[in-house]
UniProtKB/Swiss-Prot annotation:
Function, in words: Forms part of the ribosomal stalk which helps the ribosome interact with GTP-bound translation factors. Is thus essential for accurate translation.
Gene3D superfamilies: 3.30.1390.10, Single helix bin
SUPFAM superfamilies on file: ClpS-like, Ribosomal protein L7/12, oligomerisation (N-terminal) domain
Name used for this protein in its record: Large ribosomal subunit protein bL12
GO biological process: translation
Protein's UniProt keywords contain Ribosomal protein: yes
Assembly mode: Homodimer. Part of the ribosomal stalk of the 50S ribosomal subunit. Forms a multimeric L10(L12)X complex, where L10 forms an elongated spine to which 2 to 4 L12 dimers bind in a sequential fashion. Binds GTP-bound translation factors.
Length: 124
């Protein structure tokens, strides 16, 4: 082991034996002495979490039509422009996607409309 390695091991062992208060004091001294900030390392470590993109496209899924199938069929027709037969088939085939790849506001609005008609709806 070289002299530099020995010094590093000794320093590490000394730090390991310190109390938390002493370690915090050491950090403060090192920040002042070397003009660095321990917070910068935390900010760099947090950066990858910000890289996660917010979802922009949503699917509205009809899980069940509930007690009022007719009202749900009407709501599906109004929202999708489907004919009566197609809307009825979609509702009866639940769970089924009503609309796919729409923005959050439209998805929330459609969910509210379908729930008011009595449907059980999910957004993914």
């Amino acid at each position: 082991m070289s002299i530099d390695q020995k010094k590093l091991v000794d320093i590490t062992n000394s730090i390991r034996e310190m109390t938390i208060t002493n370690v915090l004091d050491l950090i403060s001294i090192m920040e002042k002495e070397f003009g660095v900030s321990a917070a910068a390392a935390v900010a760099v470590a947090a950066a990858p979490a910000e890289a996660v993109e917010e979802k922009t496209e949503f699917d509205v899924i009809l899980k069940s039509f509930g007690e009022n199938k007719v009202a749900v069929i009407k709501a599906v027709r109004g929202a999708t422009g489907l004919g009566l037969k197609e809307a009825k088939e979609l509702v009866e085939a639940a769970p089924k996607n009503v609309k796919e790849g729409i923005n959050k506001e439209e998805a929330e609005s459609l969910k509210k409309t379908l729930e008011e008609a009595g449907a059980d709806v999910d957004i993914k």
